Regions:
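Positively charged, helix-rich recognition surfaces that bind polyanionic ligands
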Residues: 1-225
Length: 225
């Protein structure tokens, strides 16, 4: 069985680990943040005007412009999701991966941001996996972010202690060594589904990730007018 395990987030959109002895990969999520920040910056004055507008025609025009900007932002996010899913599927094919595990991300909603359609990404990736005969498994992430993979801890309540996450993206192992927290979470997703893989310990599972930047839309200077 050749497996990749994916932890989904925002700053790091995808932390991808494996059981084939290769380094983890971190796909950065700065594109998602940039899209939302751009949307918020551009629409904030429009939303303020909308609150103060009493003329029906003016309100309709402002609402139309806000919705148009939201649609443009979502289109860029869809483009990013497509590019990320292509990268993941290509990686799977090149490394003969037959099973893809992915944590079910808890989406945080902010009123001033476009809601990121994570569900679309999951469906897109699942469809591509089915086409290439790759098993696709969604995994409940409970206890994966507060337990330590490299200390041999199962992702259970008994071992859960999130205080060891000393910084947003750093996890402190029991011996004092720090590893990438998203990589730790990704490995724990794998352990949750296939604990037998680690009966003989975690030697051979690499810690240091390779960072992947996937740029689209405004990242490449392609700003729609």
């Amino acid at each position: 069985m050749r497996i990749i395990s994916i932890n989904i987030g925002m700053n790091n959109f995808a932390a991808i680990t494996n059981n084939i002895g290769k380094e983890p990969n971190l796909i950065r999520g700065k594109t998602l943040k940039a899209e939302n920040q751009w949307y918020n910056k551009i629409t904030q004055p429009l939303r303020q005007q909308l609150k103060q507008a009493y003329d029906i025609e003016q309100r309709e025009k402002l609402s139309y412009n806000i919705n148009k900007l939201a649609k443009q932002t979502i289109e860029h996010i869809f483009e990013y999701f497509w590019s990320v899913s292509e990268w993941i599927i290509t990686y799977c094919i090149e490394n003969r991966i037959d099973t893809l595990l992915i944590g079910q991300y808890k989406m945080l909603v902010r009123k001033d941001y476009v809601t990121i359609p994570y569900g679309y990404f999951y469906s897109l990736l699942e469809t591509k996996c089915a086409y290439h005969n790759i098993k696709f498994v969604r995994v409940n992430e409970r206890y994966t972010s507060g337990t330590s993979f490299f200390d041999g801890e199962p992702p259970t309540k008994e071992f859960y202690n999130k205080e060891r996450r000393i910084y947003k993206h750093l996890w402190k192992c029991n011996n004092g060594e720090c590893v990438n927290a998203d990589v730790n979470d990704s490995y724990q997703i794998m352990r949750k589904v296939y604990p037998q893989l680690f009966d003989n310990g975690v030697e051979g599972y690499l810690k240091d990730p390779k960072v992947i930047d996937i740029k689209i839309g405004r990242d490449k200077g392609d700003v729609k007018k």
